């Protein structure tokens, strides 16, 4: 005789296990930046624009309610100059990487271990990098042509982002090394392309000074408690390079920069080493 109670018990245990796995997977994916950015946009006063991000999904509510949101305006008169934070010690190495069109930006995702950066004694592994144009962060109210985000994640799943700002001028050598691949994506229907081994140490920072504050991801779900390190020196990029990063996205938009968010009495440090 078939024991239906045993079968029912096994069925419900299996169903519960599947539900638990899906829930954990969903929670993990909601922590970091979304992989597909087509569910929101950067159009002002649009139903999917920055002012409405927090209303689009329950898990995106921090975009509208968070008190530690990014980007912010880095005003010299408000920063606390310190020397104890230490240099940005990047311990990167070449890694296999993929260029991916996420809908509103181009992301360079590292498939293998690309190395780490140490902040406040904790190591954060480099996961990916992407660009925003114009810049999201401003310095004394000034917005720049381009902003690079190098996104890291620690073992505690907290995020750390190292940011480089660019003004129009000479070509950036790292972007120049990717120009052929970016042009290829611009002509492809596919959303991603493997670009082989990429060395993140080739990204030039050129300054030991940087701003440090606690903020959030600048795209949904706008997760907070992100450690931001914004390099003080503004580097250069050509108009052609900025345009190439936008054309490759295929979204016909002129901008993918979130508006500046209220600082809300947060402390912003400017690390300046003692000579």
UniProtKB/Swiss-Prot annotation:
MF-aspect GO terms: carbonate dehydratase activity; zinc ion binding
Domain Alpha-carbonic anhydrase per the UniProt entry, residue ranges: 38-272
Catalysed reaction equations from the record: hydrogencarbonate + H(+) = CO2 + H2O
Lineage per the UniProt record: Eukaryota, Viridiplantae, Streptophyta, Embryophyta, Tracheophyta
Cofactor: Zn(2+)
Keywords from the named record: Chloroplast, Disulfide bond, Glycoprotein, Lyase, Metal-binding, Plastid, Signal, Zinc
Protein name: Alpha carbonic anhydrase 7
UniProt-annotated binding residues for substrate: 218-219
EC number: 4.2.1.1
PANTHER family: CARBONIC ANHYDRASE, CARBONIC ANHYDRASE XA-RELATED
PROSITE patterns from the UniProt entry: ALPHA_CA_1, ALPHA_CA_2
